[in-house]
Amino acid sequence: ADHGDMLGERGLWYKMSFHEWSARVPFIVSAPQRFQSGRVGTPVSLVDLLPTLLDLSGDPHLEAPADRLDGQSLVPLLQGEVASLDRPVISEYLGEGAVAPMVMVRWGRYKYIACPADPPLLFDLQEDPDELANLAGRPEMQDIEVQLDQVVRKHQDLNQLHEAVVASQQRRRLVFAAHMTGTHTPWDFQPVFDATNRYMRNHLDLNDVEGRARIEST
């Protein structure tokens, strides 16, 4: 899964936030012939899946990919060569319940949440696993907060992204209104079936019918 669920914690349901109940899910790998069993506490991401699979397969494209890979191979973690990865892990949310783009950065024990519509949140998950104490704005946490905020700014300009989303919504609303004017023509894909050639008929050979059911015509 790519997310968990809020089950009443903080009065919230579903996902729609970056609190641990929603954002944290286990990344499970089962390869008993290759790796010893164990648990690793370092944050990872779904974008690590592709480089990990490339690494496991021995694919040479991992060394010189055609395009930049966002993630990092987790094979060193799986093989016990390292205990953690010292790098930020980034998550984005622009879906239901968000009035502006939200970005979460996990780096070691710290979690930082940024959103143009809300004050920043900073949690020390080692000391505060329930995320009850927001450390953002505290003088003693200034260096950590600045470091994580720079990760967000380097990743994405949230104000610019918000403007782009609103502009896209306005264009799509205009197109939708135009399509709904006069005779409505749906864009939904509608496959057309010819029943005379779809099922077994006297004029059709069994092998031809079964072949068409399995192989796309060209």
Question: PLM features: residue spans?
Answer:
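Long, internal low-complexity/basic segments
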Residues: 137-218
